[in-house]
Amino acid sequence: MDQTSLNHQTEFDIIRSHFKDLTHQKDVEKGIGDDAALVKFNSEHNNHLVVATDTLIEGVHFPNTAGAFDIAQRAMCVNLSDLAAMGAVPRWFTLGLTLPINLAQPEWLGQFSAGLKIIADQYDCALIGGDTTRGPLSVNITMLGEVPLQEAMCRDGASIGDIVYVTGFLGDGAAALKNELEKPQPSDVVRESERLFNRFYRPTPRIKEGLEIRSIATACIDISDGLVADLEHLCRSSNTSANVSIENLPIHPEVKKHYPEQYSDFALFGGDDYELCFTVPESKNLVMGELIESRSVNAVPIGKIIKSNGSGSRVLLNGRVCNSIKTGYKHFE
């Protein structure tokens, strides 16, 4: 492999060859190629601009065996998940890509841009700028979207008596990471690992669900660090606590089968699920039930918002204080 190819490809060559096709959208006046992007934003609609950013670093957020296509899709999906938690519609994104010289090759960059494009097209958002530089592999995406005024879901609106819901399945992300780190695996786990592999690298951003629930949910957060940790963040912002019924957690049958001793911990503390955890007042619970029955929203109730005692905001599990040692993923620990 030509170790000097990064010198032969300028930043502008890389952009022109691999990322130019991601910029086409009617509301993008000037995308990549200028000092800054210029986009049309119709303030007459009285929408908030929603901005979310995440950095994914090799060896911290994805294994060093991950392929370019998969890294790109994971980076897109986890950022879109933040917009989903706000009830926002994605519009644009920027990309900060740091590459070691051995990866700055047409094949790797082509796979990476192909992964970006599939997700960008699926969620109708355009690349409008960014930066490329040499260094250890990391991907930073800043996602921009919009949401009507007074309709954004935040973390601070939960009230005592609200029902706690989660979308999708919990524990898949932790099970997937365990699979990735423990290869080779028994053949029965390998057959299941394709679903888990996709759940890790392509978690479904719950944009549709966010739009459906934003008019009835009182608070929302996406589950990146683990249900208990993220629900505790929500409770702390709302000055409340929560009680979760462990038996109500939605866990995929295959995860239960392959990890009978660990699936509860995966669901509660594992993280990387990128599902939505949200609260709905009892007065709107019938409406929520109709959304679930019509399959507009794939979600289940798992608990209730309760009053905090003198110890501050907590998440109880079946009425008992959670083991603080297992409070979810923390960066750099």
Name each model feature, range by range.
Residues 56, 89-181, 304:
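Glycine-rich anion-binding loops of enzyme active sites
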Residues 70-94, 111-122, 206, 212, ...:
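Small-aliphatic-rich amphipathic alpha-helix that forms the alpha element of a beta-alpha
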Residues 2-11, 17-20, 47, 67, ...:
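Glycine-/charge-enriched secondary-structure boundary and capping motifs
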Residues 1-67, 86, 95:
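Extreme N-terminal cap/leader segments of soluble proteins
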Residues 26, 33-34, 44-48, 88-92, ...:
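Short coil/turn connectors at secondary-structure junctions
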Residues 190-233:
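Polyanion-binding loop/helix "lid" in catalytic or ligand-binding cores
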Residues 38, 79, 87, 127, ...:
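Residue-level signal for inorganic ion chemistry
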